[in-house]
A protein has these predicted regions:
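Solvent-exposed, polar/charged alpha-helical surfaces in well-ordered, non-transmembrane soluble domains
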Residues: 3-7, 15, 52, 64, ...
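Flexible coil segments in periplasmic/lumen-exposed cytochrome c-class electron-transfer proteins
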Residues: 19-49, 64, 79-138
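Electrostatic cytochrome c docking/interface patches
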Residues: 1-10, 24-26, 138
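Sec-exported extracytoplasmic/periplasmic mature domains
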Residues: 7-13, 19, 59, 71-75, ...
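A bilobed periplasmic-binding-protein/Venus flytrap-type ligand-binding module shared by bacterial periplasmic
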Residues: 55-56
Length: 138
C-alpha cells in the first residue's frame, strides 16, 4: 500500500506543491526530501500560501482524519491552490495509501513560512497566481 501511495502522490501532483524543487528538477528530488513542504509561496487574491509539510502533519493526524480532510476539504484552511475538488473524488483506499506513504517517510523539519493575508507582501519567493489580462492591440 505504501508503494501505491507513492505512485498516487506523484501522478496526483502532490509533490508539485509539497516538495521543494520538484518542478524545477523535473521530479529528480531525493526521496528523503519529498513531502516536506515548500518555502516558495503561491500568491493570489486570497493572500500567500505555502505547500504544507505533510510529513509533520501526518505525525499528529490520524489516518481517518486524513481521509476526511482530503475528501471534504474540512481542514479549516482549504485555500487555493489546493485542489480539494480532485482529492474529494479519490476513493478511500487511495487516500489511505497516500497517508501511509507520507507517514512512512517519517518527520522532517523544513521551516515552512506561515501563510499571509491578501495585501501583505511575502518576504521570500512566491509564484503569482493572479490572472493578467493581455493588453489590447491599438
Amino acid at each position: 500500500m505504501v508503494q501505491a501511495g507513492e505512485y498516487l502522490t506523484i501522478v496526483g501532483g502532490c509533490n508539485d506543491c509539497h516538495t521543494e524543487n520538484w518542478t524545477a528538477s523535473e521530479g529528480k528530488v531525493d526521496p528523503s526530501d519529498r513531502m516536506a513542504g515548500m518555502k516558495t509561496g503561491f500568491r493570489g487574491s486570497w493572500g500567500t500560501v505555502y505547500g504544507k509539510n505533510l510529513r509533520i502533519i501526518v505525525q499528529r493526524m490520524s489516518e481517518d482524519r486524513w481521509v476526511k480532510v482530503l475528501s471534504t476539504a474540512d481542514s479549516g484552511d482549504g485555500r487555493p491552490p489546493m485542489p480539494w475538488w480532485n482529492t474529494a473524488k479519490m476513493n478511500e483506499r487511495d487516500l489511505r495509501a497516500m497517508y501511509r506513504y507520507v507517514k512512512s517517510l517519517g518527520p522532517k523539519a523544513n521551516g515552512i513560512p506561515r501563510g499571509l493575508p491578501a495585501g501583505k507582501e511575502p518576504a521570500g519567493p512566491y509564484i503569482s497566481l493572479t490572472p493578467v489580462e493581455p493588453k489590447a492591440n491599438p
